[in-house]
A protein has these predicted regions:
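Short, histidine-centered active-site or binding-site loop motifs used for metal coordination
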Residues: 61-65, 103, 205-207
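Conserved residues at beta->alpha junctions
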Residues: 9, 149, 240
Length: 260
């Protein structure tokens, strides 16, 4: 049976309140967004991350985290942040830590954009390898580091970069269906070809310009990824940003018997 979860909501200012809502909705986990000040790694403890009311936690790293920055001092700060978070997850029984794959800086030239990770591939690859090694050590076989699709239409070297990380069993993939809908489904083929490494789905609706919309119909083929999640044992985060949208989405899933 697929395990469904929710993101921490800005409307609910504590893990405890989010866990209570998750339990009331019949969800199994809460994904803690580490952009929020109260969910920074230094404020989280094993006790705070312990399951409650039948609900456990996963972690979503700061969306601005860039462990591939060309500045070594900046890169090291990001690496230490990710390392600390993954170790905390391992010590706390948190099964996975999610990472937005950063696209880095780009320069605008006449008629095109040059992404520096594409232009300076040797430096980029070296930082990918260092990140892979350090996260694998921190995970210690107890945590999966999940890499989420964010920039398939922009960063040409992204598929190769993801495959480099996937050479380590410490890494797997998060497929964000709404992000991909806004990207013209540019990531779908890559993720389907590596479906055995997709362990997590961020499911939400989208239109041409906006994602994180409630479930119940739209550009995203919800049934397709619900079936893939069921067959592949993937977790599914109902990644909408408001309580009202979350409740609507859970009701939409119940109507099709996707969730108990």
């Amino acid at each position: 049976m697929t395990e469904f979860g929710m993101p921490t909501l800005v409307e609910l200012p504590s893990l405890e309140e989010n866990a209570r809502l998750a339990a009331a909705l019949g969800l199994k986990f809460v994904e803690s967004n580490m952009n929020l000040p109260m969910y920074q790694a230094h404020r989280l403890t094993r006790e705070r991350l312990a399951p409650r009311n039948g609900v456990y936690f996963t972690l979503h790293l700061d969306e601005g985290l860039n462990p591939f920055d060309f500045n070594p001092l900046v890169r090291e700060a990001y690496l230490q942040t990710a390392e600390h978070t993954v170790r905390l997850a391992a010590e706390s029984g948190v099964p996975c830590v999610n990472l937005h794959m950063p696209e880095g800086v780009h320069f605008k030239l006449p008629g095109r954009k040059v992404y520096l990770f594409d232009e300076y591939r040797e430096e980029y690859r070296a930082s990918l390898l260092a990140f892979r090694e350090r996260m694998a050590r921190a995970a210690d076989g107890r945590v999966t580091v999940l890499v989420e699709n964010t920039c398939f239409t922009r960063l040409r070297g992204l598929p190769e970069a993801l495959d480099t990380l996937l050479e380590s069993p410490a890494f797997a993939l998060t497929y964000d269906a709404g992000h991909d809908a806004c990207d013209g489904f540019a990531a779908a083929e890559f993720y389907r070809a590596r479906e055995g490494r997709v362990k997590h789905v961020h499911l939400h609706q989208a239109n041409e310009t906006t994602c994180h919309l409630p479930l119940g119909g739209g550009r995203v083929d919800e049934n397709d990824w619900l079936a893939r999640a069921e067959n592949g044992g993937m977790r599914v985060v109902i990644e909408v940003k408001s309580r009202e949208g979350l409740e609507r989405s859970v009701n939409a899933l119940r109507e099709r018997n996707a969730i108990a």
